[in-house]
Amino acid sequence: PEQIKKYKSSKDLKIYNSSETLYMEYNQTGKVKGLTNAKIREALNLATDRKGIAKSVSEGLDSAATGITPAGLALTSTGGDFAKAAAKATAYAYNIKKAKKLFAEGMKEAGLKKMTLTVEGTSDSTTSKSTLDTIQQTWEQLPGLTVKEKLGNCSQVC
């Protein structure tokens, strides 16, 4: 992010689409009571501010992922961007109001009043910390949820 701030207005800056999409997986082993509840997982999806993450990580140069396929990587049979076509059916829009409602329902179903989650990222990446900070900030708006961050090298957290 610091280098982007420094060079963002430079006419020499060239921006290329990346062929990667970063995503999260929820540990559903049962070790964290609550993550097996579909309403809680959906609430976390709705409470994930993808645009906020993209902005904090790239100073607005990246776009928020709307699916597993990166924008500009593949075309549909009609020549359109496959990522845009697929997003219509799969994307979660940031909706903290709906997230709070679903989270409360899920917590009640799971018999929980409080829950602590740990989000992990790699210390090998220059963007992991700002990504985790944004996730922590938005998820902790859900009543009863505490979010901890864990950074480690890929062999520890990947």
Annotate the PLM regions.
Residues 4, 23, 37, 41, ...:
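Extracytoplasmic/secreted envelope proteins and their assembly/folding machinery
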Residues 1, 104-158:
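Ligand/substrate-recognition segments at binding pockets and active sites
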Residues 1-31, 56:
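Extracellular/periplasmic solute-recognition and catalytic clefts
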Residues 27-34, 40-43, 83-92, 121-125:
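Second-shell loop/turn segments in exported
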Residues 18, 27-29, 56-58, 69-72, ...:
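Active-site-proximal beta-strand/loop segments in catalytic clefts of secreted hydrolases
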Residues 8-9, 31, 40, 45-62, ...:
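Sec-exported extracytoplasmic/periplasmic mature domains
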Residues 64-105, 124-129:
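Structural transition elements
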Residues 19-21, 64, 114:
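Extracytoplasmic
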